[in-house]
Each structure stands twice: as C-alpha cells, then as structure tokens.
Curated annotation (Swiss-Prot):
Family named by the database record: Belongs to the ATPase delta chain family.
GO molecular function: proton-transporting ATP synthase activity, rotational mechanism
HAMAP family reported in the protein's UniProt record: ATP_synth_delta_bact (MF_01416)
Native source organism of the sequence: Leptothrix cholodnii (strain ATCC 51168 / LMG 8142 / SP-6) (Leptothrix discophora (strain SP-6))
UniProt name for this protein: ATP synthase subunit delta
InterPro entries named among the record's database cross-references: ATP_synth_OSCP/delta_N_sf (IPR026015), ATPase_OSCP/dsu (IPR000711)
C-alpha cells in the first residue's frame, strides 16, 4: 500500500496544481468518478491486456465514468493510462482529495455508529466535532453494529471513541489489573 501512495503522490500534486487554476470542485467530482471506475478489477484486467490499445482503454474508462470530462481531466486520464498507472488512480484520487481538503481547511472524518444517525442528530454531532477538532469536517458515516451503542470518530490520526464496546473494553482492562 505504501508503494501505491508513493507512486500516487506526484500525480496527485500535479493534478492539484492544475486543478486550482480552475473550478476545483468540478475536478474533484470528475477524478472521483474516474477513481470509482478504476477500482473495477475487470476493467484493470482489460486495461492490462496487450491486445488493447491505450486509446481503447481511455474510451472505456471515460465512458464508464458517467460524467463529462473537462479537457484537463481528459489529459490527466490519458497520462495515467499511457504510463500504465490506471490501478493507482484510486490512490491518486484519495491524495488529491486530501490536498484539496487541506487547502480549504477541511478534514475528512469517518464516523462509525452502531445505529443510523438522523440528519438533525448528525448535524449536531458534526458541529460539536468541528468545534472539538478546530476545523471544518467532511463526514462519512458507516454503520458498525458491533459498537453496541455510541460512536467512534476518526479524523486523520486522531480517534474519539465513545462507543459502548470501547467502554466495556476499558472496564475489562481495569477489572483485570
């Protein structure tokens, strides 16, 4: 995984340098769509076939993305395909999004909850978390029933775990000590 990140970094940085000259949000949408397509194992197998030209791979990926690609993103996709880096595209998208978020003062937050969170509750939780972490958060909520109750929040390398499972584990450690 580390080698994917190493290969992806220069692409993501170059992509960000070009994207910030225009509408970054459009670039994020298009690159995310391409990354989703590139995660498909059958597509990567097709792209790796020596019988398939780079132009054919480009046509299939661009069509499968389902969004109209700007000229800059088209050039980026051609470069990635020509360099045989289609499999790295999801990692490039992750690093590109991280650069965009860092520049705008936003951090990605993963919220794991035992139960579905209502939109009003989520808004309250996000407001409290933004105050606690001191920055705007882009939130992704995932259901994780094994937490029993409460939530676990991951922002960068910081973890805030208020789940029942974590409390029970702390009690177990305290009682066995």
């Amino acid at each position: 995984m580390a080698e994917l990140a190493t290969v992806a970094r220069p692409y993501a940085e170059a992509l960000y340098q070009v994207a910030r000259q225009g509408d970054v949000a459009v670039w994020v949408e298009q690159v995310s769509a391409l990354a989703q397509v590139a995660e498909n194992a059958e597509l990567r197998q097709f792209a790796g076939s020596p019988k398939v030209s780079a132009e054919q791979v480009y046509d299939v990926v661009a069509a499968a993305a389902g969004v109209s690609l700007s000229t800059g993103v088209q050039h980026f996709l051609r470069t990635v395909i020509d360099n045989g880096r289609l499999a790295v595209l999801p990692a490039i998208a992750v690093q590109f999004n991280a650069l965009v978020n860092a520049a705008s003062g936003v951090a990605d937050a993963a919220i794991f909850s035992a139960y579905p969170i209502e939109p009003a509750q989520l808004a309250e939780v996000v407001a409290a978390l933004e105050q606690r972490f001191g920055r705007k958060l882009s939130v992704n909520v995932t259901l994780e029933p094994e937490l029993i109750g409460g939530i676990r929040v991951v922002v960068g390398d910081e973890v805030l775990d208020t789940s029942v499972k974590a409390r029970l584990e702390r009690m177990k450690v305290a009682l066995s000590a």
